[in-house]
Amino acid sequence: MDTPFLIEQVYDAPIEKVWQALTDKDKMKKWYFPQLKKFEPVIGFRFEFTDDGSHYKKEWQVTRVEEGRKLAHSWTYKDYPGSSEVTFELFEEGNKTRLKLTHTGLASFPTDPHFARRRFEDGWKQIIGSNLKNYLEN
């Protein structure tokens, strides 16, 4: 059974600023993946990249956009089985914003340690709980 990974974080930033951080390529490169060459928050837009020092090419496709509220993209690896989806949802909480990230389909990836659920969990905790927080609040 594939249990989705879920993480939530509240940022001391307005929802518009968080949305821009999630959808503007130049802003995304500062907290998400610096090697990202292009991105458009448009359903069907495909993008790919490889982490520095890795031979695992990530292939993503935007699957859902609700302006200012929700962004989702598929997450696959070139030449490897499995497909997952990442969904970012934003909620206004006064002058702050709560982000809810859900990553489904992790069990569909190979049993190779690179695809271990724990790697994804640790990665998202760093990206959402630290990288994005520091980017938005400093």
Language-model features: locations:
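Charge-dense, helix-prone N-terminal extensions
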Residues: 4, 16, 47-48, 57-61, ...
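Short, hydrophobic/aromatic-enriched beta-strand segments in well-ordered soluble domains
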Residues: 9, 101-103
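A conserved amphipathic terminal alpha-helix motif
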Residues: 105-138
